[in-house]
Amino acid sequence: MYKLVLVRHGESKWNKENLFTGWTDVKLSEKGVSEACEGGRILKEEGYSFDIAFSSMLVRANDTLNIILCELGQSYIDVEKSWRLNERHYGALQGLNKAETAEKYGEDKVLIWRRSYNVPPMPLDESDKRHPIHDSRYKNIPKSELPSTECLKDTVARVIPYWTDKIAKAILEGKRVIVAAHGNSLRALVKYLDNMSEEDILKLNIPTGIPLVYELDKNLKPVKHYYLGDEDKIKAAMESVANQGKKIDR
């Protein structure tokens, strides 16, 4: 039996402001730092330790991982970072307020942009400075692979090869693995692991900073999964994620 721990980064400053973030590199809020500390504390209390960690190229996930490993006294372990674990690219929506966008275009349309499986938001033009081709951290990635926008289907298409080539390989080698990433890159992975339908993945809400444990059989098929922590806090955190795209009250 293998165990895999997944953690969505703690609340970022743009999460706090209810903005579409995507590939924009935004730091953790004070609450996000506290969430990461709490996640690390819970993992330590439950006796978890790790041999290798995987994360994205974005600071909010990297800092969450660093805080957790510091809480565990394991800052020394190997960390592999990849753009394939980045958040879903939200195209021209990046930087816009989710609730105000819902007021302008309607909640249903924003829900489709946020959570549909195969409908991407409006793309960024390559001349836009927000486009990843202008970010030096991706200079070694072929331009043709860098997205202008993504739907969840696109995110799945880049996450799963990394799972197969890197993460699953490490697990099968007997390494204890933690992955610190993002709401949609983790949803992509969960969809694959649990063989979820496109309809069911629409309803999945992964809370920030709360460790999600998968117990896997010898073929890396899930036996069960569960969050670590207080059940009421977990439920409230999931509801908070679900409410982000709703219209603001006047």
From Swiss-Prot:
Keywords: Gluconeogenesis, Glycolysis, Isomerase
Domain of life: Bacteria
GO terms for MF: phosphoglycerate mutase activity
InterPro entries in alphabetical order: His_Pase_superF_clade-1 (IPR013078), His_PPase_superfam (IPR029033), PG/BPGM_mutase_AS (IPR001345), Phosphogly_mut1 (IPR005952)
Active site: H9, E87
Entries under CDD domains matching the protein: HP_PGM_like (cd07067)
Keyword Signal: no
Keyword Isomerase listed: yes
Gene3D superfamilies: Phosphoglycerate mutase-like
Site note Transition state stabilizer, residues: H182
Involved pathway(s): Carbohydrate degradation; glycolysis; pyruvate from D-glyceraldehyde 3-phosphate: step 3/5
Ligand binding (substrate): 8-15, 21-22, 60, 87-90, 98, 114-115, 183-184
One record GO biological process: glycolytic process
UniProt enzyme class: isomerase
EC annotation from Swiss-Prot or TrEMBL: 5.4.2.11
Catalytic activity: (2R)-2-phosphoglycerate = (2R)-3-phosphoglycerate
Family per record: Belongs to the phosphoglycerate mutase family. BPG-dependent PGAM subfamily.
HAMAP family for the chain: PGAM_GpmA
Function: Catalyzes the interconversion of 2-phosphoglycerate and 3-phosphoglycerate.
Name recorded for this polypeptide: 2,3-bisphosphoglycerate-dependent phosphoglycerate mutase
Organism: Borrelia recurrentis (strain A1)
